Amino acid sequence: MAEPDYIEDDNPELIRPQKLINPVKTSRNHQDLHRELLMNQKRGLAPQNKPELQKVMEKRKRDQVIKQKEEEAQKKKSDLEIELLKRQQKLEQLELEKQKLQEEQENAPEFVKVKGNLRRTGQEVAQAQES
């Protein structure tokens, strides 16, 4: 490569160009990564050498192991968690029953509602007379 002619001239008015800093080479993380990739390539552990099927199988195995660990963690619930789940289920059942009763009352014919109101007023009048 030819040397630029401004290097030979000792003109003090010229600003000498400085070599640009390569951020990739100065980055310590990038150097470590590059060194690791070179070592893996020499050993034959390069990720590009694996066939696609093998990559997919390894990913499935990893996913399976993770799923098994999560299931085991769920199975190992403490007594407190079990009791809380039971209470939550009971509360949900009570809410469902209340909703069913409300729906039945809303869907009931008008004469059934009036009959219930008459009974209540009759009972209230009877209690007021007894007092």
From Swiss-Prot:
Residues 61-112 form a coiled coil. It comes from the Eukaryota. The modification N-acetylalanine is found at A2. Residues 39-78, 100-131 are annotated as: Disordered. Keywords: Acetylation, Coiled coil. Residues 52-78 have a biased composition (Basic and acidic residues). The modification N6-acetyllysine is found at K50. PANTHER family: DOWN REGULATED IN RENAL CARCINOMA 1/TU3A (PTHR16768), PROTEIN FAM107B (PTHR16768:SF1). Belongs to the FAM107 family. This is Protein FAM107B. It comes from Homo sapiens (Human).
